[in-house]
Amino acid sequence: MKRTNYAGNITEEYLNQTITVKGWVAKRRNLGGLIFIDLRDREGIVQIVVNPETAATEVAEAADKARNEFVLEVTGKVVERASKNDKIKTGGIEIEATAIEILSTSKTTPFEIKDDVEVLDDTRLKYRYLDLRRPEMLKNITMRHATTRSIREYLDGAGFIDVETPFLNKSTPEGARDYLVPSRVNKGEFYALPQSPQLMKQLLMTAGLDRYYQIVKCFRDEDLRGDRQPEFTQVDLETSFLGEEEIQELTEELIAKVMKDVKGIDVTLPFPRMNYDDAMNFYGSDKPDTRFELLLTDLSALAKTVDFKVFQEAEVVKAIVVKGAADKYSRKSIDKLTEQAKQNGAKGLAWVKFEKGEFAGGVSKFLAESTDSFVNELKLTDNDLVLFVADSLDVANSALGALRLTIGKQQGLIDFRKFNFLWVIDWPMFEWSDEEERYMSAHHPFTLPTKETQAFLSADGHRKDSDLKKVRAHAYDIVLNGYELGGGSLRINSRDLQEEMLSALGFKLEDANEQFGFLLEALDYGFPPHGGLALGLDRFVMLLAGKDNIREVIAFPKNNKASDPMTQAPSIVADKQLEELSIKLANKDQ
């Protein structure tokens, strides 16, 4: 029989009508005289009622046999419910069943299909098709759909063209590790799955498309965490002839539409701007969470005046003040903060409590003679806790930035109802990599440097590594609640400048042509000024849904070992397949 509507949509408008619904048994209760079945589908739950004494024999038997997760087709009359349930949309009605057909039976599930059930992550992933039946997960997945629909509506209306770019690409350096795909036809050669469509979308600009977008899968072989997956989805944009502010304005309008369509929230435009240096110096992060204060203070000048070797020998001394919370932090809890600071590169964590007009505990004996100066500089009041890091500027910012987030959560300083958007602008072009022992591009090698700092790229033989620190980029990141939501930049459209950039990154001209020759050649054929941005769709939906792990908004994600417990991917393949690809495994038995 044809379904009348989704079970979760049957409301008072159907009163006294005979309807048909189909779905899964969420709960079955036999209360002696009556059998109640909660029937669930993607839209919600409706209550089915069967009176064994008055119902047809086959209806009573089907209701008696039904168990959790059986799939049923139910036909019946919609009647007013005696005891209403205001918590659900269908709570004012119930269906008196006149026909029940069991479409499919079910074994006992490995976990209850309901929200807030405690299950191991890998068990949820192994039975993901069951996990997705839970109302919360269905809500997350439908929210993802609503988000992509809103994005497409805006971009289509703004003149963007949706273009698919290839998944089988050339492997290029600079960035995370590639996922490699061996070629059977071209023995010993490999494709790389795209970390982003960066170069392809730039080539679409010189092709004359003017405005491109794509909601696209990307792949990065990197260590996983809550907001990362080996395969992820980004909203990829590129435009010709637009400046930095125009691209930001367009992105703001896109986000504002999504927020209104998906969350019913009106966001204020334009979003605030913060330059990179201020983000690092005051928040200790290039993706600052601006929902709360707890800013970093530079005490270097004052700290050098005290008789404390650790302060005197450090490049900088910075601090955060936890207002009115000194009595909430025991020595043990401060030790935990110290360990976190060390994990972020600091040698240690100095601290004092300000109690009854004087410093106590920690390094208080070294600051006693300068109490008034520190009190005035930090605007201290009674029961404040001060945490210091004395180290290099980068380490002090990083360590205190991490502590800031931890303390913000501990002290309830964060308003989790807020959506605080922010642009971080004026980025450095390069950042030092301890692992590579060289400067690397902070975003990617195709970012346009500012005119004022391009001279520091000069490859005339006099450039020093330290000059690269002075180069600034036309780059911009969009941040939401302490997460990088996306990043973009204006791009280089001059071959000479692009070759200078690659040279600064250590590429010899021959290597540059080997890796990026197709782009360099394209730059000889009238390449327009262009720029763009990519938004992380998974991360955006995660934040809209109020989750802290993108697995909650992806239908079939991987675990933290980049594995799929359901399909057992990745897996060993047959020797014959490897032979066809001319691949021989090293240390196969280890």
Swiss-Prot record:
<feature type="binding site">
    <location>
        <position position="174"/>
    </location>
    <ligand>
        <name>L-aspartate</name>
    </ligand>
</feature>
<keyword id="KW-0067">ATP-binding</keyword>
<dbReference type="InterPro" id="IPR004365">
    <property type="entry name" value="NA-bd_OB_tRNA"/>
</dbReference>
<comment type="similarity">
    <text>Belongs to the class-II aminoacyl-tRNA synthetase family. Type 1 subfamily.</text>
</comment>
<keyword id="KW-0648">Protein biosynthesis</keyword>
<dbReference type="InterPro" id="IPR004115">
    <property type="entry name" value="GAD-like_sf"/>
</dbReference>
<dbReference type="GO" id="GO:0006422">
    <property type="term" value="P:aspartyl-tRNA aminoacylation"/>
</dbReference>
<dbReference type="InterPro" id="IPR045864">
    <property type="entry name" value="aa-tRNA-synth_II/BPL/LPL"/>
</dbReference>
<dbReference type="InterPro" id="IPR004524">
    <property type="entry name" value="Asp-tRNA-ligase_1"/>
</dbReference>
<dbReference type="InterPro" id="IPR002312">
    <property type="entry name" value="Asp/Asn-tRNA-synth_IIb"/>
</dbReference>
<dbReference type="InterPro" id="IPR012340">
    <property type="entry name" value="NA-bd_OB-fold"/>
</dbReference>
<comment type="subunit">
    <text>Homodimer.</text>
</comment>
<feature type="binding site">
    <location>
        <position position="484"/>
    </location>
    <ligand>
        <name>ATP</name>
    </ligand>
</feature>
<dbReference type="InterPro" id="IPR004364">
    <property type="entry name" value="Aa-tRNA-synt_II"/>
</dbReference>
<feature type="binding site">
    <location>
        <position position="229"/>
    </location>
    <ligand>
        <name>ATP</name>
    </ligand>
</feature>
<dbReference type="GO" id="GO:0003676">
    <property type="term" value="F:nucleic acid binding"/>
</dbReference>
<dbReference type="InterPro" id="IPR006195">
    <property type="entry name" value="aa-tRNA-synth_II"/>
</dbReference>
<keyword id="KW-0030">Aminoacyl-tRNA synthetase</keyword>
<dbReference type="GO" id="GO:0005737">
    <property type="term" value="C:cytoplasm"/>
</dbReference>
<dbReference type="Pfam" id="PF00152">
    <property type="entry name" value="tRNA-synt_2"/>
</dbReference>
<dbReference type="Pfam" id="PF02938">
    <property type="entry name" value="GAD"/>
</dbReference>
<feature type="region of interest" description="Aspartate">
    <location>
        <begin position="198"/>
        <end position="201"/>
    </location>
</feature>
<keyword id="KW-0547">Nucleotide-binding</keyword>
<dbReference type="InterPro" id="IPR029351">
    <property type="entry name" value="GAD_dom"/>
</dbReference>
<dbReference type="GO" id="GO:0016740">
    <property type="term" value="F:transferase activity"/>
</dbReference>
<protein>
    <recommendedName>
        <fullName>Aspartate--tRNA ligase</fullName>
        <ecNumber>6.1.1.12</ecNumber>
    </recommendedName>
</protein>
<feature type="binding site">
    <location>
        <position position="443"/>
    </location>
    <ligand>
        <name>L-aspartate</name>
    </ligand>
</feature>
<feature type="binding site">
    <location>
        <position position="220"/>
    </location>
    <ligand>
        <name>L-aspartate</name>
    </ligand>
</feature>
<feature type="binding site">
    <location>
        <begin position="536"/>
        <end position="539"/>
    </location>
    <ligand>
        <name>ATP</name>
    </ligand>
</feature>
<dbReference type="GO" id="GO:0005524">
    <property type="term" value="F:ATP binding"/>
</dbReference>
<dbReference type="InterPro" id="IPR047090">
    <property type="entry name" value="AspRS_core"/>
</dbReference>
<comment type="function">
    <text>Catalyzes the attachment of L-aspartate to tRNA(Asp) in a two-step reaction: L-aspartate is first activated by ATP to form Asp-AMP and then transferred to the acceptor end of tRNA(Asp).</text>
</comment>
<dbReference type="GO" id="GO:0140096">
    <property type="term" value="F:catalytic activity, acting on a protein"/>
</dbReference>
<keyword id="KW-0436">Ligase</keyword>
<feature type="binding site">
    <location>
        <begin position="220"/>
        <end position="222"/>
    </location>
    <ligand>
        <name>ATP</name>
    </ligand>
</feature>
<feature type="binding site">
    <location>
        <position position="491"/>
    </location>
    <ligand>
        <name>L-aspartate</name>
    </ligand>
</feature>
<dbReference type="GO" id="GO:0004815">
    <property type="term" value="F:aspartate-tRNA ligase activity"/>
</dbReference>
<dbReference type="Pfam" id="PF01336">
    <property type="entry name" value="tRNA_anti-codon"/>
</dbReference>
<dbReference type="InterPro" id="IPR047089">
    <property type="entry name" value="Asp-tRNA-ligase_1_N"/>
</dbReference>
<keyword id="KW-0963">Cytoplasm</keyword>
